[in-house]
């Protein structure tokens, strides 16, 4: 072999060694330019909002852009409402806010402050089943129609709304607002004193069973107020909410058994075929929901919790417990949330409320079927309400109204992705195929101009834009247009915007 040929062979061998040694680096660098299959996979569609938990979606986005998926993500919260407050009631407020559920604290202190029978423990359960007229309906009619002091809230300090239970229930029913009714033997002021806390003897249980039966029979059989959702007590594990000391789980289990039995008897006997729902355990930051799923699942069909703070922390934990049982597809309600600490005059707190509504309308372990913010009105002069005792609407009333407009009523949802940690967004459509884009900004200092890509849902459309911030209380601020599916929006600090893009046939 010639020397030149030997030299060429040697150089070829050396070059091959260099290439093989560098191959892992070349492969790594090439991968940075070519997206993997996982990175190009589209997001999931058609996920049931009360389905099992979803795997996390890893999708990148530019910080000041929002990209909306064209595939349905889930459905929004079906029922968004409020708890009552004793100082006021005006159906026009509920309709303006856009709520479709109202949480009422019923029970003995409200409608049986004195035993309706002259003999404790009578009529018995068997006597009532034999003849419901064994109950003193004259006293029930009086309490529900002509309450003490002219107010169905006679059990609360003044000022009180002046009106009776008939008016309250009839107006809610006429407005098609779903009533969630708490059934409790004692209230948060530990009344009535004649009712044991908790019931223990046969006569105690006769009294409680009769009260539950009489409440529902009066509302739905003697009258037709369509009350079909019942909460078993209110925070029974909290000393300030009735029982002293707080109930044990065993005591609550027995209480739930008698409560459910009375509810079921009314519906099966007098309202056959009518759907009804029983909620439990109405606790906050507790392991009771997990235990109830194992101990008394036969006595309730709707998981019921209270969450004060970020929705995700309480809701995700309870969904995990539900997924481990046969309860995975049953509804989860948050029948109290928001604040009882006088925080509804803060724009930043209003943004946290909007964010919770968005979380609750997200699929998987964050999903909330129904919710009732605490509270719509003040209790007496205690500033817990979105509306004060004089009728003035606090700042966060308007945050709630904006969020409800976007999310109320089991609407199809579409994932709306942004890379900006201050922004949270979701998109929904209504029955008329109008598209709603809701964006919140939790930064107290930084406003943002964002670019929105809605091309997967719409190409061209005109819109109406509402804004909530320190200068705007859910007011219309513009009419953005969509061109080739694109638009730009300005999001104020500690603010939110909602854009409704109108569907054109």
Task: Enumerate the language-model features and the residues they cover.
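Substrate-binding cleft and catalytic face of glycoside hydrolase catalytic domains
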Residues: 97-300, 304-313
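Mature N-terminal, pre-catalytic/accessory segment of carbohydrate-active enzymes
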Residues: 2-88
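Alpha-helical scaffolding within the catalytic cores
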Residues: 63-68, 87-90, 162-167, 212-214, ...
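C-terminal beta-strand-rich structural cap/linker in extracellular carbohydrate-active enzymes
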Residues: 480-505
């Amino acid at each position: 072999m010639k020397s030149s040929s030997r030299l060429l062979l040697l150089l070829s061998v050396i070059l091959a060694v260099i290439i093989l040694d560098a191959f892992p680096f070349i492969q790594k660098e090439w991968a940075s330019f070519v997206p993997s299959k996982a990175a190009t996979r589209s997001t999931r569609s058609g996920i049931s909002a009360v389905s099992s938990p979803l795997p996390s979606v890893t999708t990148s986005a530019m910080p000041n852009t929002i990209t909306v998926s064209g595939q349905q993500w889930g459905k929004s919260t079906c029922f968004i409402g409020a708890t009552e407050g004793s100082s006021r009631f005006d159906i026009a407020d509920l309709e303006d806010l856009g709520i479709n559920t109202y949480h009422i604290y019923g029970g003995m202190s409200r409608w049986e402050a004195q035993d309706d029978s002259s003999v404790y423990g009578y009529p018995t359960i068997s006597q009532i089943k034999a003849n419901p007229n064994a109950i003193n309906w004259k006293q029930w009619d009086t309490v529900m129609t002509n309450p003490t002091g002219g107010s169905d809230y006679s059990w609360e300090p003044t000022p009180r709304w002046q009106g009776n239970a008939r008016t309250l229930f009839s107006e809610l029913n006429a407005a098609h607002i779903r009533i969630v009714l708490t059934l409790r033997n004692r209230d948060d002021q530990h009344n009535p004193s004649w009712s044991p806390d908790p019931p223990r003897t046969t006569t105690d249980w006769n009294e409680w069973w009769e009260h539950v039966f009489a409440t529902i029979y009066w509302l739905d059989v003697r009258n037709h107020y369509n009350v079909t959702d019942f909460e078993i007590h209110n925070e029974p594990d909290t000393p300030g909410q009735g029982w002293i000391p707080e109930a044990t789980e065993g005591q609550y289990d027995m209480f739930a058994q008698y409560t459910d039995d009375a509810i079921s008897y009314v519906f099966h006997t007098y309202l056959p075929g009518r759907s009804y729902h029983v909620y439990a355990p109405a606790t906050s930051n507790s392991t009771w929901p997990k235990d109830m799923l194992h101990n008394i699942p036969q006595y309730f069909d709707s998981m019921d919790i209270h969450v004060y703070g970020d929705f995700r922390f309480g809701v995700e934990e309870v969904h995990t417990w539900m997924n481990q049982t046969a309860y995975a597809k049953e509804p989860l309600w948050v029948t109290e949330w928001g604040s009882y600490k006088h925080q509804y005059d803060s724009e930043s707190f209003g943004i946290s409320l909007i964010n919770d509504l968005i979380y609750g309308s997200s699929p998987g372990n964050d999903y909330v079927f129904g919710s009732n913010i605490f509270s719509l009105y003040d209790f007496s002069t205690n500033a817990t309400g979105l509306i004060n005792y004089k009728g003035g609407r606090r700042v966060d009333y308007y945050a709630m109204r904006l969020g409800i407009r976007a999310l109320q009523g089991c609407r199809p949802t579409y994932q709306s992705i942004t890379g900006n940690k201050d922004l949270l967004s979701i998109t929904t459509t209504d029955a008329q195929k109008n598209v709603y884009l809701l964006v919140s900004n939790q930064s107290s200092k930084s406003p943002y101009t964002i670019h929105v890509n809605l091309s997967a849902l719409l190409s061209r459309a005109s819109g109406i834009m509402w804004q909530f911030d320190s200068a705007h209380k859910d007011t219309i601020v513009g009419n953005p247009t969509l061109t080739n599916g694109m638009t730009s929006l300005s999001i104020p600090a500690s603010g939110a915007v909602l854009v409704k893009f109108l569907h054109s046939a």
